Amino acid sequence: LSVVALDARKAGIVDQEVDVFTVKALFSTLTNVDFDPARFVDLIGRCAVLRDALKNRAKKAGAIINEKPAVVTFQPETTVTGLVGQAKVASLKADTQANADIQSLQHILLFGIKGVAAYADHAQILGQEDDKVYAFVQEALAAISRENLDLNGWVGLVLKCGEINLRTMELLDAGNTTAFGHPVPTKVPLGAKKGKAILISGHDLKDLAQLLKQTQGKGINIYTHGEMLPAHGYPELKKYPHFCGHYGTAWQNQAREFAEFPGAILMTTNCIQKPRDAYKDNIFTCGLVGWPGVTHIADHDFAPVIKKALELPGFAEDREGKSVMVGFARNAVLGVADKVIEAVKGKAIRHFFLVAGCDGAKPGRNYYTEFVEKAPKDTIVLTLACGKFRFFDQDLGDIGGIPRLLDVGQCNDAYSAVQIAVALSQAFNCSVNDLPLSMILSWYEQKAVAILLTMLYLGIKDIRLGPSLPAFITPNVLNVLVENFAIKPITTPDEDLKTILG
């Protein structure tokens, strides 16, 4: 579809339906989004229908469609078994004679544009689009399908992916802040209130807004889970009195946490895991998320979720708990930039750490908890994405009224972190690389790859990456990253802090 769309674009034909479908279909293939085979059979079949319709339309308009690439005439099977058989041929790994370094860069590009697609879909839902985002996603997919580029050509596309992802995160930032206001520092309870309850997980703030609106006056309290935590900082969401707190931690702990939750559960976007029998009847999906046998809400009418919440017992009594602060996105942080600059100049703040990225179950992720705990008291820790759940409830104190732990937001709020870094570099009249700022990133899935590519596009160096380096990066490609960007694997918190701070 992207090969045809790219050829059609050369003749001035741009199809909005194709563009939106492309990012939604790509987003569906992200880790922990859609596990429903029937939906993928439909998606793949629809993709072929859209491709053939666009091909015919483009030809009639005088476009030259290159039909040599097999993907332009490929007809998918209509069953799961048939498609699995075809997948062995379609896979990037199918060509065993291919250059391993080029295959590595193709994988990086593919994972990167999947991350871009996720953010583009969220932005589009909130009314924010840029045609160059769709055009690049199609350019990248077409290149993977048919281009015979050299190593430098693929490196160029990978860095362009970082550029496009920056623009996409900017669109999503505009969508979120236009619809819900700029986040403000907000205290979020981690306990629970007596009463009926719904837990909402994932990333989609529009779904949350709809749920809050539909549950007004029904005696149901709404709790966030996972990356929904930063939603409490948005003025147009926090205004609802029944939006009462946060429950649980990161995505990989959901089986235990969901089983103990006494209400209904709504999964938006990723990150769903196989539901346990204990709560399978209480969990719902919406948007692009899917699991076979789980009720899917396709139209933002959350009546079934509300009905289930009213049937379930809810919390029998109030539960005391800690509280955490959220809402330190670019607007809030830059609003106190003068205090931050003064504290740096007065040596009250020695260094900033951006400790961010995905969480996961793999051993070694306790590095991030230990790193934050051991960071000296004259340092500030900015965090975003679900990696924060390794330490989000730590009380690190403050420096002159500035909290030492600043939650910038969801993974896409890397845009906010970049804007904060750029503003500080301008204030100190230096490059971002010359700031007293170190980036300690954890990676797990495709959005983290897209964010890393954005950092590389911006020329940011000395990024520490863990808990291990991605398996799809070959030694030669890693060498390019090390030589050009000084990327390095994490070691131990003590060793890395010593190297950074001296």
Mark where each language-model region is:
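Boundary segments of small protein-protein interaction reader/adaptor domains
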Residues: 41-44, 103-134
